[in-house]
Amino acid sequence: SPKRQELRSLKDINLRINDLPNIKRNKYSVVIDPGHGGSDSGAVGIDGLQETDVVLDVSKIVTKLLLEKGVSVKMTRDKEVEVDLSPRVALANKTNSDIFVSIHANASRGKKRYINGIETFYYSGWRGRLLAEKIQKEILKVSPGSPDRGVRRGRYFVIKRTNMPAVLAEIGFVTGRLDARRLEKKIHRRRVAFAIAKGILEYFKRVG
C-alpha cells in the first residue's frame, strides 16, 4: 500500500541521515533555491508533472537534511509563490552564505520523451566547479540509467550574480519517459534530496 511504502521510505531516510558526512556544526550556511513557483510552473512534463512542485519538494527535504547536520539554511521560497530572480540573488548576497544551490528540472524542446539526463551548471571558479561535480556525482548514483549530461559552465542569472560559489542542478527531465516516471515518486525525490545534501556536505568537507 502507498502508506506502507511511505513508511518504508521514511525509515530508509532516517537510517541514511547517519550515512551523510559529518562536518563541523554551526559553521556553514547555504541558500537553497527551488526554481520557479506560483503561477510560474517552470517546465510541464508527462501527465502534467510540474517542475515547480518537484523542485520545491526536493528542496524542502535537502533543507531538512542539512539542518540535521548543523548547517544554517535559507530557502528562497518555501511554498508555491512566484519569486523574481533578483530577490533570490539578494537573499544569498545579503545573508553572506557560503554557497548557493538552485534546484531545477529540465524539459526538452518538443517534449521528446527519449531525452533524459542529469546536468549541473556553475558560473565560474574552482569552488563552483567542485560543488557542481560533487552534486552531479551523487544525483547520478540515485538515477541509474539516466544519462550523465555533465558539469558545465552556465550563465544563468542566479548563479552569475551571486557572490559565492553557486550551482544550478537539473535533476532530470519532466518531459523524459525515464526521468518523469521517477520524479513523480516521493521516494525518488527523497533520494535526489539526499544526494544533493551529500554533495554539499562532501564539498564542505573538502574545502574546509
What are these regions (language model features)?
Residues 1-208:
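Catalytic-site microenvironment of enzymes
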